Curated annotation (Swiss-Prot):
Changing residue 215 to A: Reduced interaction with AP3M1. A motif (Nuclear export signal) lies at residues 243-256. This is Dysbindin. The gene is DTNBP1. Interacts (via its coiled coil domain) with KXD1. Interacts with CMYA5, PI4K2 and RNF151. Component of the biogenesis of lysosome-related organelles complex 1 (BLOC-1) composed of at least BLOC1S1, BLOC1S2, BLOC1S3, BLOC1S4, BLOC1S5, BLOC1S6, DTNBP1/BLOC1S7 and SNAPIN/BLOC1S8. Interacts directly in the complex with BLOC1S5, BLOC1S6 and SNAPIN/BLOC1S8. The BLOC-1 complex associates with the AP-3 protein complex and membrane protein cargos. This BLOC-1 complex also associates with the BLOC-2 complex in endosomes. Binds to DTNA and DTNB but may not be a physiological binding partner. GO terms for cellular component: axon; axon cytoplasm; BLOC-1 complex; cytoplasm; cytosol; dendritic spine; endoplasmic reticulum membrane; endosome membrane. GO terms for biological process: actin cytoskeleton organization; anterograde axonal transport; anterograde synaptic vesicle transport; blood coagulation; cilium assembly; dendrite morphogenesis; kidney development; melanosome organization. It comes from Homo sapiens. The lineage of its organism: Eukaryota, Metazoa, Chordata, Craniata, Vertebrata.
Length: 351
């Protein structure tokens, strides 16, 4: 449409220029034709003047119109140039739009592929997230196992330390117990020796009196012979023993021999600790009422019962009167009992 309008404007301009050229050529021809006029024909100046003025006016009008047409053509040309530039831009835009529209199927295919890739990436991200959660759980388990291993090592070290402390404590208790046992045995041996000495002296005096007179007759009470320290022995109980009815010397010899044989039998069983007590004569001191009621033969029975007690106990013979009180070291016995029960309890606590 614009091209046809432009062609028309160009054709009008060409026609206008060709018309001007034809007019100028005609005026020149008229001038050339007017020259060969001869003198006989006289010009009519008034008619020519009118004609010339009319031509001049016409040419002036034509020239003015030509200028107006030229200015209008220039304006139209500028407008046409502007419109052509504008429509060229529109054309390029339309061409680009057409090209973009032609690229729409490829763009849609790319979008579909991108959507599929995004779906695949979403699945991959979910898998990675699950793997990260699993890795976090594994890290937590590893940390827990490491803490458990450290705690177990600390527990083992604590057990080892406690076992060492227990062994040290047991060794100390054993040493203390052995020391106390030795002290108690020494004290007991001293008491036994002192008591044995006292009874030997009393028995020797009574035996000498019996061998010399044949009977025992105590006229007055005698003071205890020897120092008994912590042991309280009532010697008057021995003085109240009445042996006057023993008239048979053979029975006395049998009694003495039986006592010596029993002592020799007991000495190997008692071991080295009782070697000092082999010559000890054990007597059971009866009450005064029992002495009056029982015959003199009860002394042998007392000796046999004491001998059986010694053999059953398996320890050094201890002679006690009815009124004597021997207190056992309860602290030592308690510590010994705790020591025997401690290893089992310590092992239970360690486990």
């Amino acid at each position: 449409m614009l091209e046809t309008l432009r062609e028309r404007l160009l054709s009008v301009q060409q026609d206008f220029t060709s018309g001007l050229k034809t007019l100028s050529d005609k005026s020149r021809e008229a001038k050339v034709k007017s020259k060969p006029r001869t003198v006989p024909f006289l010009p009519k100046y008034s008619a020519g003047l009118e004609l010339l003025s009319r031509y001049e006016d016409t040419w002036a009008a034509l020239h003015r119109r030509a200028k107006d047409c030229a200015s209008a053509g220039e304006l139209v040309d500028s407008e046409v140039v502007m419109l052509s530039a504008h429509w060229e831009k529109k054309k390029t835009s339309l061409v680009e739009l057409q090209e973009q529209l032609q690229q729409l199927p490829a763009l849609i295919a790319d979008l579909e592929s991108m959507t599929a890739n995004l779906t695949h990436l979403e699945a991959s991200f979910e898998e990675v997230e699950n793997n990260l959660l699993h890795l976090e759980d594994l890290c937590g388990q590893c940390e827990l196992e490491r803490c458990k291993h450290m705690q177990s090592q600390q527990l083992e070290n604590y057990k080892k330390n406690k076992r060492k402390e227990l062994e040290t404590f047991k060794a100390e208790l054993d040493a203390e117990h052995a020391q106390k046992v030795l002290e108690m045995e020494h004290t007991q041996q001293m008491k036994l020796k002192e008591r044995q000495k006292f009874f030997e002296e009393a028995f020797q005096q009574d035996m000498e009196q019996y061998l010399s007179t044949g009977y025992l007759q105590i006229a007055e009470r005698r003071e205890p012979i020897g120092s008994m320290s912590s042991m309280e022995v009532n010697v008057d109980m021995l003085e109240q023993m009445d042996l006057m009815d023993i008239s048979d010397q053979e029975a006395l010899d049998v009694f003495l021999n039986s006592g010596g044989e029993e002592n020799t039998v007991l000495s190997p069983a008692l071991g080295p600790e009782s070697s000092t007590c082999q010559n000890e004569i054990t007597l059971q001191v009866p009450n005064p009422s029992e002495l009056r009621a029982k015959p003199p033969s009860s002394s042998s029975t007392c000796t046999d019962s004491a001998t059986r007690d010694i053999s059953e106990g398996g320890e050094s013979p201890v002679v006690q009167s009815d009124e004597e009180e021997v207190q056992v070291d309860t602290a030592l016995a308690t510590s010994h009992t705790d020591r025997e029960a401690t290893p089992d309890g310590g092992e239970d606590s360690d486990s």
